[in-house]
């Protein structure tokens, strides 16, 4: 074996030696490592495809056979179509909880919609759980509650005095502890977030499932969005959420009677909620935590896709990013805390345990986020610099195209936005990956809770917030997105000059997407200091 003393590098410059070392490093270390990573990503890609295909097939079969919840389960409306003529004794006692935290733009909407529900007035209690610290928000809530109380509605405004222990879970728990909940013998509890506006017949269409099917613990309604057409970002959110409800929630409800509770627009059987030990604030996804624990005790859930509740999508990127952090960090952290509980549980079958651990948590809450960013934004771009590594088309084109089409079908009107959806979702995958890792590693932001900013239906408010004077260009810059965009652009340029494929087309487009987000030109530019409380 040649050494330096043999004269191998005698005629080489320093740059030549460095080049030789780099070339050897490339062949001995980088190429083998990258090949293994590509192979691993191919396996993960197949697993995600199988899971997506499974859910799509289930939904297709359910639709073809017409197996709606009303046909599969016992469902009977209450005796009289006229709520004023129907004996109130036919209707169970319902508690409606509306947790609020400094949401003055929307709180009146949700309170008003809840008070207009078609249900005997003596058979429902509306409980406004106001943890607000802003005086204006507190005043609006008090006035709205007094207004409806004067019209004969049983409505309670409960304030914890700025002591927001446990965030939303803490507020819901505190609400259940009030003596009148037991005195009125409430059987079911409905949760609406502050921006949710149910239709008057919401209870009439959901509660019968619980009344006539004692094994059902939760009825989850779908969502519809009042501001979906506000900007491209809200349209993309609508596409993702429509897929979540139409495919993920519906398939879980149809096969196993399980899905993750969405935290709002749902009706719980109070007995089942209490048997599952109620709300816990150990993570920032108290809704999913409760759903898993209730399911492990034998409860079943039903998703009713023909009942939808209007709400508002976050229209600024900042608000959306904070929301996605909570939705990615929380499930990963919950998985870490509850995995052993699932394994040791004796009430559910092995198949259900596998589904919870592998499909529900591992694939859909952890792997999908990390894989999407790492493969499509890190590993795949790197392969253009290593021509020795070939990535098959089924990994880069066929599988992702199929999964993308399955997502887009849920929102036909936005199908033409499919390219924007792909590029934006890859950008968001970076934030979701960070959130997932924070949840798994339990770093400092693991209990970070930032209320998603909503603007309500005030056009004046929206106009005033669109282009504020203090929102300068440097304030918009997001350096993580810019750095990833530069990496993708460099890889794309290298492939354009030296490559033999057309991967540079994707790389240039994806780099542009990262740059656009990086300079703050996505969503409605509504800068503000977010309301944040973290432990």
Swiss-Prot record:
EC number(s) stated in the UniProt entry for this protein: 2.4.1.32
Annotated residues for binding of substrate: 193, 195
Highest taxon of source: Eukaryota
Primary localisation category: Golgi
TM regions (residue ranges): 42-62, 366-386, 403-423, 482-502, 503-523
One annotated GO molecular function: glucomannan 4-beta-mannosyltransferase activity
Purpose: Probable mannan synthase which consists of a 4-beta-mannosyltransferase activity on mannan using GDP-mannose. The beta-1,4-mannan product is the backbone for galactomannan synthesis by galactomannan galactosyltransferase. Galactomannan is a noncellulosic polysaccharides of plant cell wall.
Coiled coil residues, start to end: none
Keywords from the named record: Cell wall biogenesis/degradation, Glycosyltransferase, Golgi apparatus, Membrane, Transferase, Transmembrane, Transmembrane helix
Lipoprotein listed as a keyword: no
Any one of the GO CC terms: Golgi membrane
Subcellular location(s) of the protein: Golgi apparatus membrane
Active site positions: 131, 287
Similarity comment: Belongs to the glycosyltransferase 2 family. Plant cellulose synthase-like A subfamily.
Protein name as catalogued: Probable glucomannan 4-beta-mannosyltransferase 14
Catalysed reactions, semicolon-separated: GDP-mannose + (glucomannan)n = GDP + (glucomannan)n+1
Membrane topology annotation: Multi-pass membrane protein
């Amino acid at each position: 074996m040649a050494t330096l003393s043999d004269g191998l590098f005698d005629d080489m410059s320093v740059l030549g030696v460095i080049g030789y070392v780099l070339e050897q490093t490339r062949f001995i270390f980088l190429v083998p490592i990258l090949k293994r990573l590509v192979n691993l990503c191919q396996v993960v890609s197949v697993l995600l495809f199988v899971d997506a295909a499974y859910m799509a097939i289930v939904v297709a079969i359910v639709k073809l056979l017409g197996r709606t919840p009303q046909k599969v389960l016992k469902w009977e409306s209450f005796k009289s179509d006229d709520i004023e003529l129907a004996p109130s004794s036919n209707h169970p006692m319902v508690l409606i909880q509306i947790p609020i935290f400094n949401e003055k733009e929307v709180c009146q909407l949700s309170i008003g919609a809840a008070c207009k529900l078609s249900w005997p007035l003596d058979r429902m209690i509306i409980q406004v759980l106001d943890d607000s610290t802003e005086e204006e928000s507190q005043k609006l809530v008090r006035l709205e509650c007094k207004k409806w109380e004067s019209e004969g509605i049983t409505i309670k405004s409960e304030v914890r005095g700025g002591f927001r222990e446990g965030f939303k879970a803490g507020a819901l728990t505190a609400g259940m502890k009030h003596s009148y909940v037991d005195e009125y013998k409430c059987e079911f509890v409905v949760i609406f977030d502050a921006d949710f506006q149910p239709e008057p017949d919401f209870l009439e269409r959901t509660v019968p499932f619980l009344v006539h099917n004692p094994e059902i613990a939760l009825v989850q309604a779908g969502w519809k969005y009042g501001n979906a057409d506000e900007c491209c970002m809200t349209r993309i959110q609508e596409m993702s959420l429509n897929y979540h409800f139409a495919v993920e929630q519906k398939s879980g409800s149809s096969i196993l009677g399980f899905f993750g509770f969405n935290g709002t627009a749902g009706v719980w059987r109070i007995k089942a909620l209490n048997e599952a030990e109620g709300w816990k604030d150990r993570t920032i996804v108290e809704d999913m935590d409760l759903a898993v624990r209730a399911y492990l005790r034998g409860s079943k859930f039903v998703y009713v896709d023909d009942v939808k509740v209007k709400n508002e999508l976050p229209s600024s990127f900042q608000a959306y990013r904070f929301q996605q952090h909570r939705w990615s960090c929380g499930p990963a952290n919950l998985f870490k805390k509850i995995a052993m509980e699932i394994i040791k549980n004796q009430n559910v079958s092995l198949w259900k345990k596998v589904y919870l651990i592998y499909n529900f948590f591992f694939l859909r809450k952890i792997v999908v986020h990390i894989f999407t960013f790492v493969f499509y934004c890190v590993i795949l771009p790197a392969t253009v610099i290593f021509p020795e590594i070939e990535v098959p088309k089924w990994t880069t084109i066929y599988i992702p195209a199929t999964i993308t089409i399955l997502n887009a079908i849920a929102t036909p009107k936005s199908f033409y936005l499919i390219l924007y959806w792909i590029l934006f979702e890859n950008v968001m995958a970076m934030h979701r990956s960070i959130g997932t890792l924070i949840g798994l590693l339990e770093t400092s932001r693991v209990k970070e809770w930032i209320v998603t900013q909503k603007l309500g239906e005030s056009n004046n408010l929206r106009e005033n917030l669109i282009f504020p004077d203090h929102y300068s260009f440097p304030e918009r810059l997001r350096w993580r997105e810019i750095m990833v965009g530069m990496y993708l652009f460099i890889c794309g340029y290298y492939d354009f000059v030296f490559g033999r494929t057309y991967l540079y087309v994707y790389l240039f487009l994806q780099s542009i997407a990262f740059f656009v987000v990086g300079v703050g030109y996505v969503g409605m530019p509504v800068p503000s200091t977010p309301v944040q409380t973290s432990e």
